[in-house]
Swiss-Prot record:
Superkingdom to which the source organism belongs: Bacteria
Protein name: NAD(P)H dehydrogenase (quinone)
Cofactor: FMN
Binding-site residues for NAD(+), renumbered to this chain: Y12
HAMAP family reported in the protein's UniProt record: NQOR
Keyword Plastid (UniProt): no
Catalytic activity: a quinone + NADH + H(+) = a quinol + NAD(+); a quinone + NADPH + H(+) = a quinol + NADP(+)
Amino acid sequence: MTKVLVLYYSSYGHIETMAYAVAEGVESTGAEAVVKRVPELVPEEVAKSSHFKMDQPAPVATVDELAEYDAIIVGAGTRFGTVASQMRNFWDQTGGLWFSGKLVGKVGSAFTSSATQHGGQESTILGFIPTFLHHGMAVVGLPYAFQGQMGVDEIKGGSPYGASTITDGDGSRQPSAIELDAARYQGAHVAKLAAKLSA
């Protein structure tokens, strides 16, 4: 059975919600989805005073376990147009996996969030791609076959690079139905391709 890791970092819960939608998409294909998060780097008292979402039941991933999966779909909010440091820090510890080629041939994909429509969603997802390529992974996005990313009738995230959500500056906007559909589509798309590559 194809095994897919949905690995995320979420300060306020938006990416967490998207991660579980991605996992639903993975499971819709018959593949196994495992949802885990990366460790928090912010001191607990600072996280609490900043109103971070502290009750996230997903277990914390370890670097070594990445080799156990056929595909890895990562999600993290944008920070000034690039990947949040918590996720970047996690991947910066994968040198041993790179040296041994443990991720070569696996599928890599990414999703994100930002406060505004032009807050760096595409640059954040693109920020993951060099890491995937250095590991020898096959990069997969969100194809235009998902028609939900078309049109200008409503505010919505999502691009050919990957699913995304727009949170508003105060975090009050939750992922919309179309954004969650995009996450599910991406999860299913990745799982199907991973199954073919690992056959």
